[in-house]
Regions:
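Transmembrane alpha-helix boundary/anchor motif
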Residues: 1, 33, 37, 73, ...
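Transmembrane helix boundary and interhelical loop/hinge segments in multi-pass membrane proteins
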Residues: 1-11, 172-173
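Alpha-helical transmembrane segments and their short interhelical loops
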Residues: 13, 17-90, 97, 146-149, ...
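Aromatic-anchored segments of alpha-helical transmembrane domains
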Residues: 38, 98-104, 125
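Transmembrane helix-loop junction
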Residues: 40, 44, 79-80, 84, ...
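Membrane-interfacial helix-loop-helix junctions in multi-pass membrane proteins
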Residues: 50, 104-158
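Junction motif at the cytosolic side of a transmembrane helix
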Residues: 77, 81, 139, 151-173
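Central hydrophobic cores of alpha-helical transmembrane segments
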Residues: 91-95, 120-121
């Protein structure tokens, strides 16, 4: 379809990848803002406590941006690696479920067996979740979450770079 036509145009494919990345990055940030808004405004309407944003607002935005970059990079890598949408959707769904389970999204890492606790240290979901927990619950600073921020940015850089390389090797022109 349209991707084939875009590939046939001579020139760099970078704007295509950058455009996709920018769009989905913004979608992630919009989702984050909507979830925060639900916690602040909707939860009290249901008789629940209002979400309190502890920590530094700049650190929360930085963490959300880094999580969005990591998630977008991962999605982009899956999209360019697999040949069909069905393959990408299947792998993406299963891998996200596995990464979230390992990363402590379903079950807190501290109740996992030691081997899984060690494995969870390699999950981007764990890095993001740990950073948000530290910011919201422990009023952490940017300095204290910096190791996870660097990991998330590194993951984003690796996945986006791999996406560009794979995309270039599959370019028709």
């Amino acid at each position: 379809g349209s991707m084939l036509r875009l590939r046939l145009i001579s020139g760099s494919q970078f704007p295509v990848i950058a455009g996709k990345f920018a769009f989905y990055f913004l979608v992630c940030l919009i989702q984050f803002v909507m979830m925060i808004a639900v916690g602040i405004f909707v939860m009290p309407l249901m008789g629940l406590n209002r979400l309190l944003l502890g920590g530094e607002p700049g650190a929360i935005l930085l963490t959300a941006s880094c999580v969005a970059m990591a998630a977008t990079g991962y999605g982009l890598l899956i999209a360019v690696y697999f040949r069909t949408a069905q393959q990408a959707l299947s792998f993406g769904s299963v891998s996200v479920v596995i990464l979230s389970a390992i990363g402590g999204v379903w079950v807190p890492v501290y109740v996992m067996p030691e081997i899984l606790q060690n494995i969870s240290r390699f999950s981007p979901m764990s890095w993001g979740l740990e950073s948000f927990n530290d910011l919201f619950l422990r009023e952490a600073t940017i300095a204290s979450i910096l190791p996870n921020i660097v990991r998330l940015l590194g993951f984003a850089l690796v996945t986006v770079s791999a996406s560009v390389i794979i995309h270039k090797t599959r370019t028709v022109v």
